[in-house]
UniProtKB/Swiss-Prot annotation:
Its EC number is 2.3.3.13. Isopropyl malate synthase; part of the gene clusters that mediate the biosynthesis of AM-toxins, host-selective toxins (HSTs) causing Alternaria blotch on apple, a worldwide distributed disease. AM-toxins are cyclic depsipeptides containing the 3 residues 2-hydroxy-isovaleric acid (2-HIV), dehydroalanine, L-alanine which are common for all 3 AM-toxins I to III. The fourth precursor is L-alpha-amino-methoxyphenyl-valeric acid (L-Amv) for AM-toxin I, L-alpha-amino-phenyl-valeric acid (L-Apv) for AM-toxin II, and L-alpha-amino-hydroxyphenyl-valeric acid (L-Ahv) for AM-toxin III. Induction: Expression is up-regulated more than 10 fold in toxin producing cultures. One of its GO terms (biological process) is L-leucine biosynthetic process. GO terms for molecular function: 2-isopropylmalate synthase activity. It comes from Alternaria alternata. GO terms for cellular component: mitochondrion. This is Isopropyl malate synthase AMT7. Residues 61-341 form the Pyruvate carboxyltransferase domain. Pathway: Mycotoxin biosynthesis. The gene is AMT7. InterPro entries: AIPM/Hcit_synth_CS (IPR002034), Aldolase_TIM (IPR013785), LeuA-like_post-cat (IPR054692), LeuA_allosteric_dom_sf (IPR036230), PYR_CT (IPR000891). It holds the Pfam family HMGL-like. Gene clusters encoding host-selective toxins (HSTs) are localized on conditionally dispensable chromosomes (CDCs), also called supernumerary chromosomes, where they are present in multiple copies. The CDCs are not essential for saprophytic growth but controls host-selective pathogenicity.
Amino acid sequence: MFEPYLTTPLLLKAANTPHHIPKMSRICSDRPSTLVKYGNRVQPFPFPERQWPNKVLKTAPVLFSTDLRDGNQSLPNPMTFEQKLSLYKLLVSIGFKEIEVAYPCANQAEFDFVRHLIETPGLIPEDVLIQVITPCQEETIKRAVESVRGAKQAILFTYLPSSDNYRDTVLKISEDDWVERARWGAAYARSITKDSEDPVVRSTRWTFNFGFEDFANARIGAIIRCTEAVRAEWNPSKDEKMIIGVASSVEASTPNVFADQIECLSGNISNRDTVRLTVHTHNDRGGAVASAELASLAGADRIEGCLFGNGERAGNMDLVVYALNLLTQGIEPGIDLSRLDEIRKVYEDITELPVHPRTPYSGAYYLKAFSGAHQDAISKGLRLRTSATQEGKPCAVWPAWRVPYLPLDPADIGRSLDDVVGINSQSGKGGVAWVVNLGLGLDLPPGLARTFSKAVKERSIHFGREMSSDEVCMAFLEEYQVLRAADKSDDDMIQAVLRTESPLVAALGQVVGLSSLSASITSHTLADDVLSYAAYANVTPEESKPSLWGVGLGVSLQQAKLRAVVSALQVSDGSMSWVRLA
């Protein structure tokens, strides 16, 4: 199958060499034991003086988007200029005030994108701060500064790897040399920005951001030492703070250990009120959001991430999840996600990455319950909340959100109550009744809901899929002949019943006051200009036979009751032909 690609002698030889693939794979697969290979990757970090577990977050940290750089570099097909611009505008519209826009030294397109933002009036609002990123090298720092020339304000971000392993393996320099390189980077950055001889450059309000890659695997003592050197060189103030950034890079520990590291660093930075601490977590172990949340308690001032968790490998921290976690704890996150499905659509179109349907908040199934027990609890909670609002008598828990199995109000992310219940073979009467209530405005009695839910389950099993709300409502109208009955006059109905030989004719007589037979009827008003009443008749034809349900709508309560019994007769007796009434 792959032979056409084996065009060189080397490839041909490799293809014909026995076991050449297993030999390569052993580099990753051979291990004497789990403990030897993976044990002690993260050094113990005893920190008994920790205070973050006792803290409660009261206000949101600044949320910082890295979608245009960290997110973009992780895509199989990087964004075009137009796509980056569309995503940038989306981020601004959502409410992000600090956005990383480019890596100017990467290529000309990155540089040109920054220039376009700065040179196009209105693209950078007065309260939005853009950030450019560069390695800690003279030419690249200079290039980054050139890219934002003329901006009213900008963040210049440079970084160095910080763990002993990375410094020894990749940089091959001592700790002293590493600290000196960081100090030099801060000094050089200041010399060509705040202290530049160019008045145009000096007119920009500069913020310097120095970052530590692989922070989670670094020694805190070394990080503190380097931070002090960088801070002293840049010389920030309370009014013009600098930023110290720490990145887990590859998530290495549990979130509580990361929080200990953050608190230790935060508490040991001199003149802490002149420094903002920003945290950049990754999701390699699945704990990016948890690590960021605990870091917020431990002293982080800014939290970095991408929409929907885009990013290298398992992704950066999901800004949507973090923000809505804040919202559902009563904290305004600072960004507007009230049209989340629209935001997701733009993201998916641009990145070509689908958001998993089970993703917290943004997934298509996040609010949807299929289980009958869950649906019943949701419908009862929503009915209680609705009735409390309509009657003007708030319950003890309102206006607080306390609906079982719904972590937030669907309206807060731009969804409707139609999204909370999915109907399939696992659904129960509560879910089916809720869908009919939303779609048709009918408040089904429990017995009718139970009976109809069985019919719905049979249909779902037959089709082998979920039934849409419209399908459920149409099935209800068909099952109980609701629309046909509503189209006929009372006289036609009476005559139609009298023409049948059904023993249930007397039940109709009871409804209109002509006789007394077994028929239990409930009713309620409708919010409809024409048909103002709905009635539900539970008719028992004979003692030995099960009861039958019918549904009727009418301009009067009497008419609705009449039609409900006729509906039950139609369900029970095939001899009753509506064709003759056409």
